[in-house]
C-alpha cells in the first residue's frame, strides 16, 4: 500500500504560532498542489493564514450553519466529529443535511474508525477484546479507546449501520426507508394474524427465571423477569 496524501496537516490541538506558520509555508512552497489543514487557528485568528480551510472539532450543526451563512472565504470541515464512544453517533442527520444545503460544507471525519483494544483471556478462560480496567489496572480511562465504528477485530458495530445510511445518496436512503416501511407493515399484519389465531390462555412461570424473546431482522428484543416477577 502507498499513502495518498490529499491534505497536509500541521498538527493537532497545539493552538497556533510562528513555528506552525512556518510549517504551513513550507508545505505551500514545496507542494502547492495540495491543501494545508490546521484546526488551531480557530482559537488564534492572528495566524488564520496557516490553514486553507476553516476547521473545528465537534462544532454543533447550528454553529457550522452560522459560519456558512456569513459568506466565508474558506470552506468548512470538521476534523473530528460524532465521537463514537459507547451508544453514541446520534444526530448525524443534522450534519449530512448541511452538505445538501451548503457547497462550502465539506463534511467531517468521524472519531474514529476502529476501537483500540488488546485481546486477552478473561476470568472464564475466554479470549476477549480487553479495554481499560480489564487488566487489573487501577488508573484507567476504561473504554475511552473504544470509540470506533468497528470493533478492534474489524467487526462492524451497530453505529456502522447509521453511518452507512447517512453517507449514502438521498435516492438510496429513500429506497431503504421504503423497504423498511414495507417490512414493518408486513410484520404488523403477521402479528395481527397471530393475535387473532391465538387461543385464550395463561402463561405461568412456576419456578426459576422467565425470558421472553422476539427475534427480528438482526435484532432481539428480550424481556426477563426474575422469580419475583417483573418489578
Model-derived features: positions:
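Short, well-ordered loop/turn elements at secondary-structure boundaries
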Residues: 72-73, 104, 208-209, 215-216
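Mature N-terminal, pre-catalytic/accessory segment of carbohydrate-active enzymes
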Residues: 175-208, 220-221
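Extended substrate-binding grooves/exosites of carbohydrate-active enzymes
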Residues: 1-188
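Acidic-aromatic substrate-binding/catalytic surfaces of carbohydrate-active enzymes
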Residues: 211-231
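Generic recognition of flexible, low-complexity loop/linker segments
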Residues: 64-66, 96, 200-203, 210
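Low-complexity, intrinsically disordered regions enriched in charged/polar residues
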Residues: 143, 153, 157, 199, ...
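Compositionally biased, low-complexity repeat tracts
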Residues: 126, 142-144, 152, 197, ...
Amino acid at each position: 500500500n502507498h499513502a495518498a496524501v490529499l491534505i497536509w496537516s500541521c498538527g493537532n490541538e497545539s493552538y497556533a504560532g510562528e513555528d506552525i506558520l512556518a510549517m504551513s509555508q513550507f508545505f505551500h512552497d514545496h507542494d502547492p498542489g495540495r491543501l494545508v489543514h490546521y484546526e488551531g487557528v480557530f482559537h488564534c485568528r492572528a495566524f488564520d493564514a496557516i490553514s486553507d480551510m476553516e476547521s473545528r472539532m465537534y462544532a454543533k450543526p447550528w454553529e457550522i450553519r452560522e459560519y456558512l451563512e456569513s459568506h466565508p472565504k474558506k470552506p468548512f470541515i470538521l476534523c473530528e466529529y460524532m465521537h463514537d464512544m459507547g451508544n453514541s453517533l446520534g444526530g448525524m442527520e443534522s450534519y449530512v443535511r448541511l452538505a445538501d444545503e451548503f457547497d462550502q460544507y465539506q463534511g467531517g471525519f468521524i472519531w474514529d474508525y476502529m476501537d483500540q483494544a488488546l485481546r486477552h483471556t478473561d476470568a472464564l478462560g475466554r479470549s476477549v477484546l480487553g479495554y481499560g480496567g480489564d487488566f487489573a489496572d487501577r488508573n484507567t480511562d476504561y473504554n475511552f479507546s473504544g470509540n470506533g465504528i468497528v470493533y478492534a477485530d474489524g467487526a462492524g458495530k451497530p453505529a456502522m449501520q447509521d453511518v452507512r445510511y447517512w453517507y449514502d445518496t438521498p435516492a438510496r436512503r429513500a429506497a431503504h426507508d421504503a423497504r423498511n416501511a414495507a417490512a414493518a407493515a408486513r410484520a404488523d399484519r403477521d402479528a395481527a394474524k397471530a393475535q387473532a389465531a391465538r387461543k385464550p390462555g395463561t402463561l405461568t412461570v412456576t419456578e426459576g427465571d422467565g425470558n421472553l424473546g422476539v427475534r427480528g431482522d438482526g435484532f432481539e428484543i428480550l424481556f426477563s423477569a426474575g422469580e419475583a416477577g417483573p418489578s
